Amino acid sequence: MNSNIFPPSKQQNELNNIQQSFSNLQSQCSNLLLNVSQTLNPLFNANTNNNKPNIFSALNSFRDQAKQALDSRISRFNSGKAPVWARISDDGGGARAQVTVPIRGSGKGLSADAIEERLAGVPVYALSNSNEEFVLVSGTSSGKSLGLLFCKEEDAETLLKEMKSMDPRMRKEGSKVVALALSKVFQLKVNGVAFRLIPESTQVKNALKERKTAGIDDDDFHGVPVFQSKSLILRSENMSYRPVFFRKEDLEKSLIRASSQQNRLNPALKPGDIQVAVFEDIVKGMRESTTSNWDDIVFIPPGFEVSTEQTQE
């Protein structure tokens, strides 16, 4: 795996400014993977038909979702120069829509393949030109290049619109937003480029709110927030594992669903039912941990709930 993808760097301040630019975007509800739910693990509950479309074709259909304008322009990046493009090595990898049953008792960190399989059903969004090269942004202060991967498609669309307004040449190059599986992030290999995930601003706010409830008062959140609950444990084929959500709302709906399935009349959440973690830290723990702390984690794509009913494939 490319160690240049997730670790913190000196460019964190620039990323924080990017996140701040998106903080005023209005929240918009969307089921990002509705058209590919039939290809996902049966634990996911989304209403759909019996078709099983190719995951890339289905993800690409989300490009037509509504665009929103930035309230503040991203002024920290050069607008006088043509955008930098970088080709990403595929290494033969493809998008796979599935959730892997946890591997227990290995006594060491999970393999790259095992981690990639758990992320295969989670989409991220990037800016690309007609040659399938991804746009890089350069900070005026550092001069270094960043490849941005967005957790929310609308955020990628608004950045594309902003960059096109600053440099009309991008329109001639066929620049667009493309979707790829988060597992593909681990295959990105571009020398001298650091790839960073940009979280949804609403989920950053949710994470800060939950941390404040837990007694942690902080105005900043570094990384992509993910949400889990000790009250939600899934079981499949005599194994138990913990679902981790990229959206707090999906976790809350899953907790309510679990309460209903367990015939609890009052599914109201108690303080402390929701815990916040950093996605990048979990992935690092999966790679490096010598214990089984992370081998029961399953990542749930945005827009999906989970069922506590035992499921067998």
Swiss-Prot record:
Gene Ontology terms: biological process: protein transport
Name of the encoding gene: TIC22L
Designated name of the protein: Protein TIC 22-like, chloroplastic
CC terms in the record's Gene Ontology section: chloroplast intermembrane space; cytosol; membrane; plastid
Keywords assigned: Chloroplast, Membrane, Plastid, Protein transport, Transit peptide, Transport
InterPro entries cross-referenced by the UniProt entry: Tic22-like (IPR007378)
Function: Involved in protein precursor import into chloroplasts.
Keyword Protein transport included in the entry's annotation: yes
Main location: plastid
Family of the protein in this entry: Belongs to the Tic22 family.
Membrane as UniProt keyword: yes
Pfam families per record: Tic22
